[in-house]
Amino acid sequence: MIRKIIISFIAATSLILFSTQAFALLNFSVGVPLSHTMTGNDTAGNEIKSDGVSGYFVQVGVPILPGIGMDSYKTKIKCAACTVELELETSMYNLYYLLPIPIINLTVGVGAGKTKFLCDGSDCSWQDGGTASQWYTSLGFPILPLFDLHLSYRSVSSKIETTTGSDKGKKDDVGGNVMGLGIGFNF
């Protein structure tokens, strides 16, 4: 009798303390980008460097089915020769799948969207923006029965074509990698 009670207690405790999103009816996640490393070059062949990133990631889903998400962030660009503050604005819409693995929450996804340069907060007149695509993964660890803390990695591909001047038709390669940190809620 005591053995059955102990086994039942362990099983109940495991379900309560180590619940994952696979048991939840709805999962909701928010996050922020921590770093954006550019891997491409501008039209002159110079390396594009990030000077900080701000924004958000949001995703919502249900178990077994793919979920949807949205990323929106701005990356300041280091530019010694620029006369204006230059930023890269990225907006993505994502489709993701939460793999049903106990204890950890592993998410894989893809996204599509747009990138554009901003000059002092407005669209730069020398470009119309470009299309962007990404793949990403997120690894979450439960911190409480209904919450998890997750670290994400995004690999973004995008090129922005110059539409005026002597560089017309040339493209800035603004692809790179974005690391993020977030928290997930499971209802």
Regions found by a protein language model. Give the residues of each.
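Transmembrane beta-strand segments of Gram-negative outer membrane beta-barrel proteins
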Residues: A24-H36, P66
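Cleavable N-terminal export/targeting peptides
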Residues: M1-N27
